[in-house]
Amino acid sequence: GKDDYVAPAGQKKDWYNAYFTLPHEFWTEQHFATLSPAALAVLLIVLKETTKKPDVELLREKMQDWYGISGKTVTKGIQELMAAGLIEERLRWEEDLSAKLGYVKHHHYGLTGVFSTEERAGRRRVARRKRRLNERKKSKKAAQEAKS
């Protein structure tokens, strides 16, 4: 983009400035070092777009406008992620009477394993529980120290 960078605030209502979860396996399994820039770009885009839904349609003709990467780069990234077993394609057929066959094929992509929407949501729930437990422990400890 042409706008100045603004750090994400992580607010639920501000979808475009929200954080997304990057599983620690991204680092421990060396994906950051072994994937090409094209695959990394697509991985990060799909991670962001699948925070609340299991897959996303990547329209190659729109990717330049939306993310600043070419359709060719998206295709290369998808192929590499599929070969690595990190992403899977889900075809959806929709009725379109203006199409030759009366249907149009849509390519949706979802991440697999620890990168999947479901797995990341589960990890966020566990982290949230742990954080709340730690906060309660700190509050109890502070209350006990205040009484002393």
Predicted regions and their residues:
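Short, low-complexity, polar/charged sequence segments that are solvent-exposed and flexible
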Residues: 63-64, 108-109, 128-132
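Short, cationic-aromatic polyanion-contact patches
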Residues: 1-14, 93-120
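Charged low-complexity intrinsically disordered patches
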Residues: 113-148
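Winged helix-turn-helix DNA-binding recognition segment
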Residues: 50-105
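Short recognition helix of helix-turn-helix/winged-helix DNA-binding domains
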Residues: 1-61
